[in-house]
From Swiss-Prot:
PANTHER family: 5'-AMP-ACTIVATED PROTEIN KINASE , BETA SUBUNIT (PTHR10343), 5'-AMP-ACTIVATED PROTEIN KINASE SUBUNIT BETA-1 (PTHR10343:SF84). It is found in: Cytoplasm; Nucleus. It holds the Pfam family AMPKBI. Component of the SNF1 kinase complex, a heterotrimeric complex composed of the catalytic alpha subunit SNF1, one of the three related beta subunits SIP1, SIP2 or GAL83, and the regulatory gamma subunit SNF4. The beta subunit serves as a bridge between the catalytic and the regulatory subunit. Interacts (via KIS domain) with SNF1. Interacts (via ASC domain) with SNF4. Interacts with REE1. Residues 19-37, 118-136 have a biased composition (Polar residues). Keywords: Cytoplasm, Nucleus, Phosphoprotein. The gene is GAL83. It comes from the Eukaryota. Residues 1-12, 257-269 have a biased composition (Basic and acidic residues). Belongs to the 5'-AMP-activated protein kinase beta subunit family. The lineage of its organism: Eukaryota, Fungi, Dikarya, Ascomycota, Saccharomycotina. This is SNF1 protein kinase subunit beta-3.
Length: 417
């Protein structure tokens, strides 16, 4: 290689050979600063991208090349593939370029290249926070919309509540109230009324309906003698109250329904979610006029208006008019004399649901079941006294109670003298 013309020799091969010979003579490795500088300068002057420089040129396989394109804002390459020193290129182990020599480049052009790459990386990293995916924007809009809906529903729930003042005036130091409005699980403390000793009260927001409650006075369950009382299923005395809505409260649901419909249309316009074709057609149909042309109009299903019913205190004429009462009794006399089938004029002695006593009815299942179980009783005879027909000079008296899905019948047999 030394005998060839220096002009025809490849510059890269000459520099590499000289660097290798100098390393052999001096007994040193690639740590020599002079050889590293010349080797770095040689590689920096080589244009490996131009196919006219080196013939024949073998294509180099790059695993990944970092390319920054400011026009492409949708996709940002992951920063995990970037090198901290800003080189920005990784080569395959099968490439002809030595990785150790490429990492030792410290020339001015290498520094400029590193600075440019670092600047581009910082520019791209600074641009990243301003670029937000559409999914994050949609998620933020959905959360804001849900908060608005929760606020509207909370206002609606508060609009259905009415203030109720519960008072206690029968002494005690610590007074609490619990009831059906708290599920009988929480106690609400009463506060004394200023200027009125011995009087304690609490103001609650309750929905319309019947509410039962009891007081806890100094760790003792009590009920107030100044409030309406009733008994629960266990026979304990409780207080109750009826919370009724104002007369003009019935018109509010219609107004709220109209406002909800208008808000729903506005929300559909503001929503950025993709709508299906059927939904878009439905919205367009609602905006179109009812007159479709050629004598056709759009049909709207409307609920019929309820008739206005009023409660009266008028007594029927059969109880006040003597002529009507006389005619009624004459009809009864004719029925008794002629034995005609006019049973509709005579009221029954017992309601129809009480005529069939459970003690007198026998189920077909009793032929197979010898346990003596009775059929499921009617709900109207629960907690009532029932009697059976007299059989064998014995009278049966029974009482039926229910516990969840079980019925217990207690029967007492009394002999007749």
């Amino acid at each position: 290689m030394a005998g060839d013309n220096p002009e025809n020799k490849d510059a890269s091969m000459l520099d590499v050979s000289d660097a290798a010979s100098n390393t052999t003579i001096n007994g040193k490795h690639s740590a020599d600063s002079t050889n590293e500088a010349s080797l770095a300068y040689t590689f920096s002057q080589m244009n490996v991208d131009n196919p006219n420089e080196l013939e024949p040129q073998h294509p180099l396989r790059h695993k990944s090349s970092l390319i920054f394109n400011d026009d492409d804002d949708d996709e940002i390459p992951p920063y995990s593939n970037h090198a901290e020193n800003g080189s920005g290129e990784t080569f395959d182990s099968d490439d002809d370029i030595d990785a150790s020599s490429s990492s030792s480049i410290d020339s001015n052009e290498g520094d400029i290249h590193d600075a440019d790459m670092t600047g581009n990386t910082l520019q791209k990293m600074d641009y990243q926070p301003s670029q937000q995916p559409d999914s994050l924007q949609n998620q933020g809009f959905q959360q804001q919309q849900e908060q608005q809906q929760g606020t509207v529903e909370g206002k609606k729930g508060r609009a259905m509540m009415f203030p109720v003042d519960i008072t206690w005036q029968q002494g005690g130091n610590k007074v609490y109230v619990t009831g059906s409005f708290t599920g009988w699980r929480k106690m609400i403390g009463l506060v004394p009324v200023p200027g009125q000793p011995g009087l304690m009260h609490v103001k609650l927001q309750l929905p319309p309906g019947t509410h039962r409650f009891r007081f806890i006075v100094d760790n003792e369950l009590r009920f107030s003698d100044y409030l309406p009382t009733a008994t629960d299923q266990m026979g304990n005395f409780v207080n109750y109250m009826e919370v009724s809505a104002p007369p003009d409260w019935g018109n509010e649901p219609q107004q709220h329904l109209a406002e909800k419909k208008a808000n729903h249309v506005d929300d559909s316009k503001l929503s950025k979610r993709p709508m299906s074709a059927r939904s878009r057609i439905a919205l367009e149909i609602e905006k179109e006029p009812d007159d479709m042309g050629d004598g056709y109009t759009r049909f709207h299903d409307e609920t019929p208006a309820k008739p206005n019913l009023e409660y009266t205190q008028d007594i029927p004429a059969v109880f006040t008019d003597p002529n009507v009462m006389e005619q009624y009794y004459l009809t009864l006399d004719q029925q008794q004399n002629n034995h005609q089938n006019m049973a509709w004029l005579t009221p029954p002695q017992l309601p129809p649901h009480l005529e069939n006593v459970i003690l007198n009815s026998y189920s077909n299942a009793q032929t197979d079941n010898t346990s003596g179980a009775l059929p499921i009783p009617n709900h109207v005879i629960l907690n009532h006294l029932a009697t059976s027909s007299i059989k064998h000079n014995t009278l049966c008296v029974a009482s039926i109670v229910r516990y969840k899905q079980k019925y217990v019948t207690q029967i007492l047999y009394t002999p007749l003298q």
